Amino acid sequence: MDQNNSLPPYAQGLASPQGAMTPGIPIFSPMMPYGTGLTPQPIQNTNSLSILEEQQRQQQQQQQQQQQQQQQQQQQAAVAAVQQSTSQQATQGPSGQTPQLFHSQTLTTAPLPGTTPLYPSPMTPMTPITPATPASESSGIVPQLQNIVSTVNLGCKLDLKTIALRARNAEYNPKRFAAVIMRIREPRTTALIFSSGKMVCTGAKSEEQSRLAARKYARVVQKLGFPAKFLDFKIQNMVGSCDVKFPIRLEGLVLTHQQFSSYEPELFPGLIYRMIKPRIVLLIFVSGKVVLTGAKVRAEIYEAFENIYPILKGFRKTT
C-alpha cells in the first residue's frame, strides 16, 4: 500500500506541499513575525472621542460669547452717539439758536438680556421746547411787581455830610456805608445817594412810582443848594412774585433741569432756576410760591412765568 494513503485523514493535508498553504489553517514559523497575514481591526477609543466633542463645544461657546460682546459694544456705541447728539441739542437748540425752555424727555433704549439700563432713573436728557399754550390762558395767574430798582445821575458832586444834617429822614454812617440813606413816605421808597452824584432808588411797585420817587429825591437835593439835575434815569431790576396754588416737587425738578437749576435745602429753602431767555432768575418754593427777578421791563416777568408754569404743573406734588 502507498505511504500517503496510510496516513490518517487529518494529516493528509500536512504531508503534501500544497497542504502547508491551505487556506484556513494558519502556519506559524519562528522566522515569521507574529501576526503576519492577519487583517488588523480598527480600534476606537471612547475617551479620545469625548475629548474632541468637549473641545468643539467649548469653541462654540466662545464664539457665541464673542458675538454677544460685539453686539453689546455696538449698542453701547449707538446709545452713546444718541446721548451726545441729545446733549448738543440741549445746549445749542434747534438751528443753532439758544433754547428758551427745557423739559424732560425719556430716551427709550432696549437693553440686551442680562445687562443694566444705561439711564438710571430719574435722570433723563433735556431737549428745548416752547410751551404750547401761554400760562395766562391756562392758569389766569399774573405776577405782581414787588420791587423796582432804578438809577439816576444828578450831574454834580455832593457833600453827603451836609445832606445828612439838613435833610429829613436821612442817615449817613461812612464807616458802614459810603452813601446817604434817605426815605420818603409817598411813594414809600428808599434812596442811596453817593458823593459822585449817582443815586439808586428802591422799593417802588411800578415804573411810574420809581420815576416819581427819584424826582422827589432830586428835588430835595436841589433845595439843599446843590445844582442837581435829572439825567439818565434807568430801571435796573424788577422783582415780581406769584402763587401757583399747588405744591411742587423740587427734587424732581432739579434732577430734570439740573443744567439750569440748583437746590440746596440746607442753605436755602427755594430752588434757583436760571432761565436763558428771557434772562430771568426764578426762586421756586415747595409751597408753590414763585419769585421772579432780573427783568428790565415788565413783559420779561410775564414771559418767564408763562414759560415756567407748564413745567411746574408737570412736577405738581400729589397729596
Curated annotation (Swiss-Prot):
Ranges: Sequence repeats: 145-221, 235-312
UniProt-annotated location(s): Nucleus
GO cellular component: nucleus; transcription factor TFIID complex
Keyword list, A-Z: DNA-binding, Nucleus, Repeat, Transcription
Pfam family, one: TBP
Binding positions for DNA per the UniProt entry: 147, 183, 198, 237, 274
MF term (GO), any: RNA polymerase III general transcription initiation factor activity
Biased composition (Low complexity): 107-118, 126-136
Quaternary structure (record): Binds DNA as monomer. Belongs to the TFIID complex together with the TBP-associated factors (TAFs). Part of a TFIID-containing RNA polymerase II pre-initiation complex that is composed of TBP and at least GTF2A1, GTF2A2, GTF2E1, GTF2E2, GTF2F1, GTF2H2, GTF2H3, GTF2H4, GTF2H5, GTF2B, TCEA1, ERCC2, ERCC3, TAF1, TAF2, TAF3, TAF4, TAF5, TAF6, TAF7, TAF8, TAF9, TAF10, TAF11, TAF12 and TAF13. Component of the transcription factor SL1/TIF-IB complex, composed of TBP and at least TAF1A, TAF1B, TAF1C and TAF1D. Association of TBP to form either TFIID or SL1/TIF-IB appears to be mutually exclusive.
Family: Belongs to the TBP family.
Protein known as: TATA-box-binding protein
Taxonomic lineage from the root: Eukaryota, Metazoa, Chordata, Craniata, Vertebrata
